[in-house]
Structure formats: structure tokens, C-alpha cells
């Protein structure tokens, strides 16, 4: 290694001519590299090691970033300054740089400030440490940079690890303590966390070597570096195995082990609410583990004996409202984020609480999805009070619930402090500046160590940003727990920081979706989460993926959804974790079969038999693994149609002639618009003309209008009056949500005026149901017509959202429109949103909206006609029942949860209908009433053989 420098002044040259360090030479004495002599400006400082030569100019800008092995120049054109600082909100670049032995002396523009950095060069990285800041106002410096590399690399930019890389080269910045923030290959320190003495390591190496160098830095600089079985956690075999995330207890552990074995999972992780009875104190849940820790340890021991490891799920720093830290007396170390002063004495019954100070910092919304300031709970002395409103003057809490969350209502004196309790996802948080952080860490680590857990999932970690800057505070509780664990540990969680990158073994690709699961996997889990992780050199797994039984807000998991995940698992050579409940696994009739399918794919992935070129093809489209003498993947397509009688559809077959394969399900029939059993959400005498989005409105998803459904008559529907006529959102003042459990389909009568666009896609309107917990279901209408029309929306069309018009987060979180906690029995609003606009935008008026009454369907002897061939199913399908024909003429009949009822042979017996190449006209008819969902399954000819197959 070498640190090559050239002094900035003749005086420094004279001084340094008599001060030589091993491996340090003057710039004019530098040897030629493989690329030849580097032209260096006068006064340059050169940093050189085995992999890279970096030249910093006297003006503080980087002049060269040369890869020595190839002679390639990686520096971005017109780079900025290597150092900077911020004082009183103003940025000052490091515009003058000189070297003094192993120190760099930097002056910052006209700030009157300078800094001294110590430079340490290692064979494959170098370290920059801040030694001092000098000059008038040095104590007013808010932040200062430790350096920034600016490679001309844009292919991959890490968000968690501060790295830029492509297939050839990588540049990375690593803080050497949790008080150093890194981003975009730069490092920053801040006054509030301490600046002098902090260090950052910079790496510029061939990409294939980056992880080796980072592991070396962890070892040489005493950074966290967890190991599993003697291997670095990020590269250990356990990281390649998935896990079953389920409510495992001492009573059901044998069944949980059986399920995990079927899916070939390496771990079972149990929910926080399963092993503990509340968040915060985390008392062992004696219902599930009757002997406390003894039961929990026995359960884990049984998993270990079966060859499985066990993960602990927790919500990082969350404190449940049912926890001893809250009731009967709240712990003073709960996090608070707003303060007011009680204006007058109050007794224990009063429901209006006056404040002597403004309440503009107190939220107006409950704690639902997201990380914004929210929650309606305040603390006065030892009483928690829940408020529902704040008066228009912003000086009084209204409609208060006294003695909330198990506390005791009590009188309070004027002048008492009113604190807002920070709330996320219905829980309070620990104030991480207090001793409660370490108490919680001791508690969790103690259970982990004593009971023999192998993995921890720090869920909800991102919410700790409520304490302060995300990059620092999100790591604090996680690290406090990690540092106390005395076992090999696989760490995952949500909320990553530069410091926790070191302890995390991999990342999970976000929560599961209950609807549009295939699109959610491709357009979010893979395109967003998996790419974000891998761009930061973090291994990833495709969980969490939900496994469902049938519910009003989502169907039961289907075989093609399982295979879709399994295919992507092989394509990306990435494991998957399955989140579900034991109850859902038991209710679903094909659980064993589908877990075995997943396990078969997992074994194939782990075997490494699928060649890279095949895996690359499997990243797109749907595929089916065909076992037999020749194992191969074949393209598969699922075309789904909702039909009433007479039901006709056209099915395309782009492949050779093949047997008709299908899935037929009886679905609820829907009443006609105007039927007295419907629930009127917007009456015809209250039309809504939808205004266009404002020019600066985020798109897609800009709100055009909203109808408050809690103000329907009695909140029960019927012919209730319309509200919300005109533009804008109207908030509820009273009333109850509407139940649409038996009215899930919508009929929208609307009028579209003005010319349609001459070319290109049409405008798209979202008729959105909003539940009282701020979750949604989207229904899209293409405005590709003019005049008046009734559009029937039998079910949500969420599968279009991510491929076509992902909503701007400022409008609504797309995940809130896909999660399973949407409840049709608690619908509070009907929203109209613009998902796509055109020029000119058609004039659109909503004339009425009805929620259509559902009725039971009965499909007797359903018959499918294809050309001149017929297939009759000799059975009756009631609502939810499924007829599955994956093999010619063999029909398996299931209930809505895929429990097998019986197997029948389709008629006639002389052969099954065939799909000819090209378009095929199909007709579906039956005796009885109702509607059907018909899915036609076609296999393609473009097979992908697996090398090594017999």
C-alpha cells in the first residue's frame, strides 16, 4: 500500500521532505501504474493502495479515481468537493486541502473554519477520521463530512449500504461507529451525536471482492459481524433457507414441525403475540406456554430435535396498551412528542379538557398505517385520556374517554403537563433516551438466550424514527438487544440503518398482500424490495407471503399462486418465508399438497440444478414444472372470466392443440341496479361532478371527491341519503360505518362528456371503498366512452394497480389497498380518485352508486362447450364451490377452502374437449341461478429443460 501526497505549499513540501512514512512518497516520485504515469495537478494529494489510486486536488475536489488493475478511470465528470460542513444551516465546501504526514488539513470556503482529518491507508480500503475542527464558531458546526467518493456508476445505488456498483467495480463508505451516517458513498457526522474521533472507511474494489473487504473491515475495525456455524451470517447456509412464520405453541408444535418439513423450511418463527401476552414487558403467554419459559424452551428443543431452528418475532420498542408498562400506572419512560398545559382544574368525569397552550402539535387522526405523527392518547399525571376531537380554536380536547387503557380517571390541577403519547400501529413506544431501552433489551435477550432461539425479527423498527433521525435512532433498540445475545443469531427486521446493515443477515421483502398477490410479488416485492436489498449487498427472501383460507375480503390461496412464488424463488435463487396461522393451514384443504409443492421447488432450487439461463427466463411470466422422464418448465396462462348465463368467452391458445383445462367456481349472484335489496351509497338526486386534479396534485390517485358513508341512514344502508356532493373530502361528524359483507359488488352510473383523446390510453377512475381503519379496495373504470352508462364492478380490480398506475404515496399507500385487514363490515367512505388523466380530461359526473345485494348461486350440471365439443360436470356447485379440471375429464370438486368433496368424471366419456391453436369460442351454461368464475388454463410449447434431468 501507499499513501502518495503532494503538499499544498512550499513550506509543507520543505517540512515533509524530511518526514517520510513507510509507503509514503511525494507525488512527483510516484511510480507508474499499469495505466502509465498519472498526470497530477500541483498540490495534489494521492491516496493509493493495492486496488485504487485516488487523487484529491488542492481545491478539495477529487481529480482521479483510478482502478489500478485495469487502468480504468471511474471518476464522475465534474465531481463536487470531497469534504464539507454545515454551520447555522449553511453548507460550506472544503475548498482548500493540504497534507501533513498522515493528516489532511481542510479549509471550508469563507466559513473561517478548518478541520484536521487523519488518513489511514490499508491494502484494500482507507480510513478517514475527524480529529478536530478549528476556527471561530467551531462549536456551531452542525454536521461535517468525512469524505465522499463520486464514481461514474449509476447502475446500482445502495440505500442501506452506502455503495455504488456495477458488474465490474464498486465504491462503498462504511461508518466505523453508529454515530456516523453514510449515504451515496459519503460519510457524515453530526454535533448532536459527537463529531471528533469518528471515522469512516472507504472501499473502491472490483465488485466481486467487496463483501470480502467489508468482512475484513468488520474484523479489523471491531465492527459487529455475526456468524452462524462459523460462517459470516450473510454468507451462511441458513440464509439460503426459508421459514414458516406461524403461531406455534407448545400444544401445536408437532403439527407446526410437520408443516415446516413439508415446505422444506429451515426455521419456524413464532409471532410476538403467540410467545408473549403483551408488547413491552413481554410476559410469556401462559395460554400457549403454560409453564412459562420452561414450556417455551421445551417447544424450541423439540424443533431443534427435528432439525429445525426457531425465530423470535418482536415489535421493536412497541408497548401494547394492555401491557404492565401502561396499566394501571403508565411508565414515565414512554415516548412523547407534544406537550401542552392544563388550563383549569378538572375532575375525574369531565370529557372536555382545556389547554392553556395551542394544540397544533397534537394529531387529529388515530394510529393506523404509516409512520406519520398520529394517535389520540394523552397523558396527564398518571392518567391516559383518549380524545376524539380538538375544538376549532385549538385549545380544547373534546369527547374524551377518561381512564383509558386501564389507567384510573382522576382529578388534575391547572398547570399540569399534557403529553401526547407517541403511537404507531395502535401501540405506544419506548423513549430510547431512557433506561427503558436497556431494560427491554435485557428482557428480550434473556428470553432468547435461556430458551434457545436462533433467529430474531425486529419488526416495526422504522417506527423508532419517532425518537429522532432515522439513520441513528432506528438502530438503537435493535443493537441493544443484539449486543446482549450470546448465541449464534440470524437477524432480520424492518427499518435498516447503516449500522444495522452489519448485523442483519438478510431482508424480508415486505408484508404480504391478500389480493393481487402475483402482481404484488413482481411489481413490489421483487421490483422494489428485493432489488433494494440486493443493491445494498443484503441477501433477501421473498417473504412475507400469506397463506389464506377464504374470507369476505380475500379468497383462499390457490395452487397457481403457490407455484408462482415457487417459480420466482428458483428464478432469483432466493428463499421464501410463509406467514399464516395454524387455523388457516387447517381450514385450507390442500395445505399439505401445496406445501409439498413448495418443498419440491425449494429442493430443486437448493440443488443448483437449474442453470442460470433458465432461471433468467423464469423471472418473467408464469411457468409450470412438468415432472417425468424429461423435467422441464412450460409456460402456463390463467385466463379468468366472471360469467352469468348465457356465458360466452373467447380463449386464445398460442400453442399446439391441447386438452381443455379449467377451474370453475360458483360465485355470489348480484342483484340488478335499482333492486330494493341494494345499499345506495350515492343517490341519483345527489350527482357528483368530479373536478380534474389540481396542476400540482400528486398522481396517480388524486382525490376527486369522497362520500362519508357513516352518515347514511343509521349507518346501515338502505336508501340512505347522499353526502359529499361536490369536490373534496368531507369528514365524518358522527354515525357508524356501513357493512357491505353481503354487498361487495358495485353498480356505478356515470356520465362522461367531451371528446375522448385521439390516441393513447383513456382516463381511468378509481371507485374506492375505504374501511374505518384506513384500508381500501380499488375498482377501476376506463373512461373510454361518452354518454351515460352503468358500470358493474363485481369485485375489486386491484391486479391493475401496480402494473398500470401505482398511486402516489401522498394520496394513499398502495399496500393499504392490498392487505388482509380490510373489512367489508366497516366501510366508512366511498372515494373517487383519478388514476390516469388525459388531455383533454373528459367531464365525468357520478350519478349514483349502489352496493349490489349478493345471493347464493347454484350451478347444476354446468356444461362447457368448445366448438362442437361439450363437457358436462355431473355435480352441483353451490356458492364458493370449485370444480378443478387439471387433468382431462377428471374433475375434482372442492369447497371454497379447497377441501375435497368428491371426484367425478366429466361427460361424455368419449373424450375431452380440445383447445385448437388460435381463438376458441367457449360457452358456459348450467341449470340453476347465480354466477360463475371460469379460469381457462393453457400450457405453452416453449419448454425450458432442466439440465441433468433423466
Write out the residue ranges for each language-model feature.
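Carbohydrate-recognition beta-sandwich/jelly-roll modules
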Residues: 47-268, 272, 290, 298, ...
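Glycan-recognition surfaces
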Residues: 325-339, 425-439, 482-585
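Extracellular ligand-binding interfaces
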Residues: 681, 687-690, 694-715, 721-816, ...
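Autoprocessing Asn-cyclization modules and mimics
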Residues: 316, 320-402, 406-409, 669-671
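Extracellular beta-strand ligand-recognition surfaces/modules
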Residues: 144-147, 660-662, 674-680, 743-748, ...
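Intrinsically disordered, low-complexity segments enriched in serine, threonine, and glycine
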Residues: 364, 402-405, 410, 414, ...
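Carbohydrate-binding surfaces of carbohydrate-active enzymes
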Residues: 296-320, 334-339, 568, 572-675
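Aromatic-lined carbohydrate-binding/catalytic grooves of carbohydrate-active enzymes
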Residues: 237, 242-339, 422-441, 445, ...
Amino acid at each position: 500500500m501507499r499513501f502518495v501526497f503532494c503538499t499544498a505549499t512550499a513550506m509543507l513540501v520543505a517540512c515533509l521532505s524530511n518526514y517520510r512514512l513507510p509507503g509514503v512518497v511525494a507525488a512527483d516520485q510516484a511510480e507508474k501504474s499499469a495505466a502509465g504515469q498519472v498526470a497530477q495537478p500541483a498540490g495534489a494529494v494521492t491516496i493509493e493502495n493495492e486496488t485504487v489510486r485516488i487523487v484529491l486536488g488542492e481545491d478539495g475536489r477529487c481529480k482521479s479515481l483510478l482502478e489500478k488493475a485495469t487502468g480504468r478511470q471511474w471518476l464522475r465528470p465534474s465531481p463536487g468537493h470531497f469534504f464539507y460542513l454545515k454551520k447555522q444551516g449553511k453548507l460550506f465546501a472544503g475548498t482548500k486541502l493540504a497534507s501533513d504526514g498522515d493528516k489532511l488539513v481542510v479549509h471550508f470556503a469563507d466559513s473561517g473554519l478548518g478541520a484536521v482529518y487523519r488518513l489511514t491507508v490499508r491494502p484494500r480500503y482507507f480510513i478517514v477520521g475527524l480529529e478536530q475542527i478549528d476556527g471561530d464558531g467551531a462549536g456551531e458546526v452542525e454536521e461535517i463530512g468525512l469524505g465522499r467518493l463520486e464514481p461514474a456508476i449509476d447502475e446500482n445505488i445502495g440505500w442501506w449500504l452506502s455503495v455504488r456498483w456495477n458488474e465490474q467495480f464498486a465504491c462503498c463508505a462504511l461508518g466505523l461507529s453508529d454515530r456516523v451516517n453514510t449515504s451515496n458513498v459519503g460519510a457524515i457526522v453530526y454535533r448532536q451525536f459527537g463529531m471528533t474521533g469518528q471515522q469512516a472507511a472507504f472501499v473502491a474494489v472490483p465488485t466481486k471482492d467487496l463483501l470480502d473487504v467489508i468482512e475484513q473491515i468488520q474484523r479489523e475495525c471491531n465492527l459487529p459481524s455475526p456468524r452462524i456455524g462459523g460462517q459470516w451470517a450473510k454468507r451462511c447456509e441458513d440464509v439460503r433457507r426459508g421459514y414458516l412464520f406461524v403461531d406455534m405453541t407448545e400444544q401445536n408444535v408437532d403439527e407446526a414441525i410437520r408443516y415446516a418439513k413439508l415446505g422444506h423450511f429451515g426455521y419456524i418463527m413464532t409471532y410476538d403475540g403467540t410467545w408473549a401476552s403483551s408488547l413491552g414487558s413481554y410476559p410469556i403467554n401462559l395460554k400457549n406456554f403454560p409453564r412459562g419459559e420452561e414450556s417455551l424452551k421445551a417447544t424450541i428443543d423439540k424443533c431443534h430435535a427435528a432439525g429445525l431452528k426457531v425465530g423470535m418475532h418482536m415489535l421493536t420498542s412497541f408497548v401494547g396498551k394492555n401491557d404492565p408498562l401502561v396499566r394501571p400506572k403508565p411508565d414515565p419512560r414512554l415516548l412523547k412528542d407534544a406537550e401542552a398545559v392544563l388550563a383549569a382544574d378538572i375532575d375525574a368525569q369531565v370529557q372536555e379538557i382545556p389547554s392553556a397552550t395551542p394544540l397544533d402539535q397534537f394529531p387529529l387522526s388515530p394510529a393506523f398505517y404509516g409512520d406519520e405523527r398520529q394517535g389520540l392518547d394523552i397523558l396527564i399525571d398518571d392518567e391516559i385520556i383518549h380524545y376524539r376531537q380538538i375544538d376549532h380554536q385549538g385549545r380544547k380536547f373534546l369527547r374524551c374517554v377518561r381512564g383509558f387503557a386501564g389507567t384510573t380517571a382522576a382529578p388534575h390541577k391547572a398547570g399540569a403537563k399534557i403529553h401526547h403519547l407517541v403511537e404507531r400501529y395502535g401501540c405506544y413506544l419506548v423513549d430510547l433516551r431512557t433506561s427503558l431501552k436497556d431494560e427491554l433489551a435485557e428482557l428480550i435477550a434473556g428470553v432468547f438466550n435461556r430458551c434457545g432461539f436462533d433467529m430474531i425479527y425486529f419488526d416495526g423498527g422504522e417506527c423508532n424514527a419517532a425518537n429522532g433521525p432515522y439513520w441513528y435512532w432506528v438502530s438503537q433498540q435493535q443493537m441493544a438487544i443484539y449486543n446482549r445475545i450470546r448465541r449464534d443469531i440470524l437477524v432480520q427486521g424492518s427499518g435498516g440503518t447503516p449500522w444495522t446493515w452489519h448485523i442483519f443477515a438478510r431482508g424480508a421483502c415486505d408484508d404480504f398482500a391478500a389480493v393481487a398477490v402475483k402482481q404484488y410479488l413482481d411489481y413490489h416485492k421483487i421490483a422494489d424490495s428485493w432489488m433494494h436489498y440486493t443493491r445494498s449487498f443484503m441477501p433477501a427472501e421473498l417473504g412475507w407471503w400469506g397463506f389464506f383460507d377464504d374470507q369476505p375480503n380475500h379468497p383462499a390461496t390457490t395452487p397457481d399462486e403457490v407455484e408462482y412464488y415457487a417459480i420466482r424463488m428458483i428464478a432469483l435463487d432466493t428463499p421464501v418465508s410463509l406467514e399464516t396461522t395454524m387455523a388457516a393451514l387447517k381450514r385450507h384443504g390442500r395445505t399439505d399438497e401445496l406445501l409439498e409443492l413448495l418443498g419440491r421447488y425449494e429442493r430443486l432450487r437448493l440443488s443448483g440444478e437449474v442453470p442460470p439461463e433458465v432461471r433468467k427466463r423464469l423471472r418473467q411470466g408464469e411457468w409450470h414444472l412438468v415432472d417425468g422422464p424429461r423435467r422441464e418448465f412450460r409456460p402456463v396462462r390463467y385466463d379468468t372470466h366472471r360469467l352469468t348465463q348465457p356465458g360466452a368467452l373467447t380463449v386464445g391458445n398460442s400453442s399446439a392443440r391441447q386438452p381443455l383445462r379449467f377451474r370453475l367456481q360458483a360465485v355470489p349472484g348480484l342483484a340488478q341496479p335499482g333492486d330494493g335489496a341494494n345499499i345506495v351509497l350515492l343517490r341519483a338526486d345527489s350527482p357528483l361532478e368530479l373536478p380534474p386534479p389540481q396542476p400540482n396534485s400528486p398522481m396517480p390517485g388524486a382525490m376527486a371527491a369522497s362520500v362519508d358513508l357513516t352518515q347514511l341512514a343509521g349507518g346501515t344502508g338502505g336508501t340512505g341519503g347522499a353526502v359529499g356532493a361536490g369536490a373534496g373530502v368531507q369528514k365524518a361528524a358522527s354515525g357508524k360505518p356501513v357493512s357491505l359483507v353481503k354487498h361487495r359488488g358495485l353498480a356505478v352510473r356515470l356520465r362522461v362528456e367531451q371528446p375522448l383523446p385521439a390516441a393513447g390510453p383513456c382516463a381511468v377512475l378509481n371507485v374506492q371503498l375505504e374501511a374505518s381503519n384506513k384500508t381500501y379496495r380499488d375498482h377501476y373504470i376506463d373512461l373510454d366512452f361518452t354518454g351515460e352508462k352503468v358500470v358493474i364492478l363485481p369485485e375489486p380490480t386491484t391486479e391493475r394497480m401496480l402494473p398500470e398506475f401505482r398511486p402516489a404515496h401522498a394520496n394513499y399507500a398502495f399496500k393499504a389497498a392490498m392487505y388482509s385487514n380490510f373489512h367489508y363490515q366497516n366501510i366508512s367512505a366511498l372515494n373517487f380518485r383519478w388514476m390516469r388523466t388525459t388531455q383533454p380530461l373528459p367531464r365525468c359526473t357520478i350519478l349514483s352508486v349502489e352496493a349490489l345485494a349478493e345471493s347464493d348461486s347454484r350451478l347444476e350440471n354446468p356444461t362447457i362447450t368448445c366448438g362442437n365439443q361439450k363437457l358436462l360436470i355431473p355435480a352441483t356447485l353451490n356458492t364458493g364451490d370449485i370444480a378443478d379440471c387439471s387433468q382431462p375429464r377428471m374433475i375434482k370438486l372442492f369447497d371454497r377452502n379447497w377441501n375435497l368433496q368428491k371426484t367425478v368424471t366429466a361427460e361424455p366419456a368419449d373424450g375431452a374437449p380440445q383447445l385448437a391453436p388460435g381463438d376458441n369460442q367457449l360457452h358456459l351454461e348450467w341449470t340453476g341461478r347465480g354466477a360463475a368464475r371460469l379460469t381457462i388454463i393453457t400450457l405453452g410449447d416453449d419448454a425450458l429443460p432442466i439440465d441433468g434431468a433423466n
